[in-house]
Swiss-Prot record:
MF annotations from Gene Ontology: 3-beta-hydroxysteroid dehydrogenase [NAD(P)+]/C4-decarboxylase activity
Residues holding NAD(+): 148
Membrane topology: Peripheral membrane protein
Any one cellular-component term (Gene Ontology): Golgi apparatus
Name of the featured protein: Sterol-4-alpha-carboxylate 3-dehydrogenase erg26, decarboxylating
Function: Sterol-4-alpha-carboxylate 3-dehydrogenase; part of the third module of ergosterol biosynthesis pathway that includes by the late steps of the pathway. The third module or late pathway involves the ergosterol synthesis itself through consecutive reactions that mainly occur in the endoplasmic reticulum (ER) membrane.
Family label: Belongs to the 3-beta-HSD family.
Keywords: Endoplasmic reticulum, Lipid biosynthesis, Lipid metabolism, Membrane, NAD, Oxidoreductase, Steroid biosynthesis, Steroid metabolism, Sterol biosynthesis, Sterol metabolism
Species of origin: Schizosaccharomyces pombe (strain 972 / ATCC 24843)
Catalytic residues (positions): 144
């Protein structure tokens, strides 16, 4: 079996950046597995990796790829986006991850790196510089983070001498390829809603530039393959290491786009919760997924920042792109996308 073969599950936002960084290294066989071919990434990287398609909720699809490619390392980034039906998260994040673990064990994979979420420890209360000792709540705020917590648990419990595993809890990803965070903030600008603010904007938040998150996955892989795999069975918070007030990040995005709100109308958190509750009830009766929820209010009003000392010590992780430069690169990419 080739010694340096890496299979990336998911070729989207994070997976694509991991593949790009892997392609910068020498002596690697690289493959990606996704529901559909990422033709844009294949074209960009000129065939430097192999693309497999299939459904990770189907064990046969997974095993077919493992049998053909023989990965030494698997980096599992695949996950549905936010605001989908509950069943989808459990099918993909929980059942799909279980399928990947089984295939890793069956085909003698050496290392599995899993993309978890910093949100797995969030229950609506403030998270102030918390580290990996923070307990996972018994009751989660949403199905996405509940399913990610269960998948993370499976991955860590699968760690052994033969299959080394690690999970990375990434926080607030943004960057080129982002289809959620920054585009969502720019849609607020487009809709003329920048003057509205939930909460007092005294809550500190962690965001993570995508290239830093990708880099952390490669560091975890390197550690697990080393003669001293200190990351085995471990979980790590990954951020930019630069906290910022929640609404300041949004306003930095808007400022880079040439807009400064002329004034601010503040809605206290209790008012936001009341409005979100009403919106959820209306959508319940209309059988629609609500866009404005109590979870979003709590998310945007709470302190949510994390201590990355463990990642620095064990993985030797240090962000390679700072927050301001990350915002600049993201908006430059979005400008380029508009022209095509």
């Amino acid at each position: 079996m080739p010694m340096n073969s890496v299979l990336v599950i998911g070729s989207g936002f994070l997976g694509g950046h991991i593949i790009r960084q892997l392609c910068e290294r020498e002596n690697l066989r690289i493959a990606a597995f996704d529901l559909f071919e990422n033709e844009k990434l294949l074209h960009e990287l000129h065939g430097q990796f192999t693309m497999y398609t299939g459904d990770l909720t189907k064990q046969g699809d997974i095993e077919r790829v493992f049998e053909e490619f023989h990965p030494r390392v698997v980096i599992h980034t695949a996950s549905p986006v936010h605001n989908l039906a509950r069943d989808i998260y459990f099918e993909v994040n929980v059942d799909g991850t279980a399928n990947i673990i089984k295939a890793c064990q069956k085909f003698n994979v050496d290392a599995l790196v899993y993309t978890s979420s910093a949100g797995v420890v969030f229950n609506g209360a403030d998270l102030i510089n918390v580290d990996e000792s923070q307990p996972i709540p018994e009751v989660h705020m949403d199905a996405y983070n509940e399913s990610k917590a269960l998948a993370e648990k499976q991955v860590l419990e699968a760690s052994s001498e033969s299959l080394k595993t690690a999970a990375l809890r990434v926080a607030g990803l943004f960057g080129p390829g982002d289809r959620q965070l920054v585009p969502g903030m720019l849609s607020v600008l487009k809709n003329g809603q920048t003057k509205f603010q939930l909460g007092d904007n005294l809550n500190l938040f962690d965001f993570t530039y995508i290239e830093n998150a990708a880099y952390a996955h490669l560091l975890a892989m390197d550690n697990l393959l080393s003669s001293n795999p200190t990351a085995n069975g471990q979980v790590f918070f990954i951020t930019n290491g630069q906290v910022i007030y929640f609404w300041d990040f949004a306003r930095a995005i808007w400022a880079h786009a040439g807009h400064v709100p002329p004034y601010i109308i503040k809605f206290p958190r209790p008012v936001g919760m009341l409005l979100a509750t009403a919106a959820e009830w209306v959508c319940y009766f209309l059988k629609k997924e609500p866009g404005f929820t109590r979870f979003r209010v709590q998310f945007s009003c709470a302190n949510r920042y994390f201590n990355i000392q463990k990642a620095e010590d064990v993985l030797k992780y240090h962000p390679i792109v700072d927050l301001e430069e990350g915002i600049r690169r993201t908006l430059a990419w979005m400008d380029t996308e508009k022209k095509h």
